[in-house]
Structures are given as C-alpha cells and as structure tokens.
C-alpha cells in the first residue's frame, strides 16, 4: 500500500541509470562490496581537434573508451580552458563532435586538467553525466567486451571502420588497438607514461 501511495503521488518512478557490475562474477555489486586498491596504468596524451585541426590534449588511462566520449570537461576556474567552454572539438579516430564544458569536479592538477567524460568509466563520469545532462553512449557489454554493433553516433566512415576493429574485443585488447591507431594517426603525443591510481574493485575479485 505504501508503494502504491508513493506511485500515485509521483514518488516512485522508473529510470535508466548506471550500476556497478562485475564482469568476472557476472553480478551486480553494491557500494558496500567495493574495496579500493592501488592499480598500475598508463597516461596517454591524446589530441582532440577543433574544426580547423588545432589540437587540445587530454590525458587518459582509458583510451579504449574514446568511442563513448560525450564531452571534454575542465574546472570552471581553470584559466587554461575558460576560453574554450561552449566550443566543440572532434574525438580522435571516431570524429564525433563533442562540447567542452565546465564542472567543479574536474581536477585542475590531475593529468592535463581537462578530461573526457565517457559513459561510463568511473563514478565521476556518472556525476558529470547527471549534472550536465549528457547523452548515454555505452560501448561495453556485461561480459566486459566491446559491443558488436557500431553505435549510431559514430557516423564518419573511417570512425565506423575503427570501431568495427575493436568490436567484441576485451577492453585490454581494444586499448592496444586504439593506442596503436592513435599513434599512427598522429593523435598520441609522446609515449604512454606509467601511473598508479586508486581503483574500486569487487571485494571478492
């Protein structure tokens, strides 16, 4: 009865929203079941480009998520990027047009200070997605592999061909393919640099 009352006054509703999922155990995971561990990775300095080809660089440990990019985000107080808010750039390899936006959760001293928001790489992506009302562009299946079908938001023929090269691959295999392609296209600045970060893991994993 309590639920029906909530439903009648609009207090109960359905919503599409991201959840935590373990690809090994194939199960949903509660926040209480997460534990933070140090995890080694690599920063990749990647060029997004304005209409005239001028680059703007982000640094990411998850280049395999480039196809899921919805926007670039920097802190509203970051003088390096204030002039770019509201402008658009194109993602490397996939040539998807994305906006440059401001959000206070962007860390000025992390990487290049400007980050790509992908749906979804971490909880910060979820926060940005909700607050800025960004599109949802999932590319990873429940089994941890890249989806088989090329998404509709990738319209550039070369971009669709690039995505097809990663379809069905694990994120680790897709990462190598993407990094090699970025290097060949001239969109990877220098070589990846080692880093360590705290990452949430399922406590049983």
Regions found by a protein language model. Name each.
Residues 169-193:
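Phosphate/diphosphate-binding loops
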Residues 144, 178, 201-204:
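Active-site cavity-forming subdomains of large catalytic enzyme subunits
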Residues 75, 144, 166-170, 187:
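Short, solvent-exposed coil/turn linker segments
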Residues 152-155, 205:
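Short, surface-exposed amphipathic charged segments that create phosphate/polyanion-binding patches used
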Residues 18-28, 194-205:
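A glycine-rich phosphate-binding loop feature that marks nucleotide/adenosyl-phosphate handling sites
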Residues 114-118, 158-170:
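The substrate-binding groove and active-site-proximal loops of carbohydrate-active enzymes
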Residues 1-149, 153:
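NTP-handling and nucleic-acid-processing catalytic cores
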Residues 9-18, 185-196:
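Short secondary-structure capping/junction motifs at helix and strand boundaries
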């Amino acid at each position: 009865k309590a639920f029906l009352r909530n439903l009648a006054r609009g207090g109960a509703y359905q919503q599409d929203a991201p959840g935590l999922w373990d690809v090994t155990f194939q199960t949903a995971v509660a926040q209480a079941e997460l534990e933070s561990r140090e995890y080694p990775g690599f920063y990749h300095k990647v060029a997004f480009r304005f209409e005239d080809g001028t680059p703007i660089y982000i640094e990411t440990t998850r280049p395999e998520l480039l196809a899921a990019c919805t926007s670039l985000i920097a802190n509203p107080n970051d003088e390096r990027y204030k002039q770019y808010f509201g402008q658009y750039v194109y993602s490397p390899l996939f040539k998807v047009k994305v906006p440059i936006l401001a959000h206070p959760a962007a860390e000025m001293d992390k990487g290049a200070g400007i980050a790509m928001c992908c749906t979804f790489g971490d909880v910060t992506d979820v926060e940005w997605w909700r607050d800025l009302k960004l599109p949802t562009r999932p590319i990873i299946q429940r089994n941890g592999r890249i989806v088989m079908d090329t998404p509709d938001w990738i319209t550039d023929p070369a971009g669709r061909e690039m995505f097809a090269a990663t379809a069905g691959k694990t994120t680790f295999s897709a990462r190598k393919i993407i990094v090699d392609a970025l290097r060949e296209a001239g969109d990877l600045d220098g070589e990846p640099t080692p880093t360590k970060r705290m990452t949430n893991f399922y406590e049983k994993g």
